[in-house]
Amino acid sequence: MRTFLLAVFTLLNVVAIQAQSLNLETDNGVKYNDPQVPASIGIVLYSNDVETVFNALRFANYSQEWDNQVQIFLLGKGVELEGLVKTNEDIKKQVDTFVGQGGVIMGCQTCFQSRKKDGSQICKVACIQDLYDLVKKNQIVLTF
């Protein structure tokens, strides 16, 4: 009986801890998971697949509509975005909307160099430190 009560007590403590973790608050009392509070979102885009790129940009634009700050870092094949913009009108519209709303797009300098390119018209050439900063400073980081 004593073991059973100890197990129940332990389980109740675990449930209480998990319930508290769902309502974590910052120092100023704002809940982390509060959908009414804007977040900072970093997106690492490392694909040149049209559907994946389109959905990443669509998500970025949707997030901006909810007053979230969004940054995109192009990595690997992601730096080929400019070519997709030239050949796909839907992606061009998404990029234009994102940049027009103040969104920031950065592209990996090394990835451009490996493709014998100096950079892109649609993004700032960036380095590994910029990618590190994006991951470190944003509350949410997604990869596509």
Where are these regions (language model features)?
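Bacterial Sec-dependent N-terminal signal peptides
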Residues: 1-25
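Short N-terminal segments immediately surrounding and downstream of signal-peptide cleavage
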Residues: 21-45
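Short, glycine-rich nucleotide/cofactor-binding loops
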Residues: 36-54, 79-86
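Histidine-anchored nucleotide/phosphate-binding helix
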Residues: 53-68
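Short internal beta-strands
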Residues: 60, 70-76, 106-109
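Mature extracytoplasmic domains of secretory-pathway proteins
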Residues: 66-91
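A glycine-rich helix N-cap at a beta->alpha junction
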Residues: 88-117
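A short aromatic-anchored loop/beta-hairpin motif
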Residues: 101, 106, 120-142
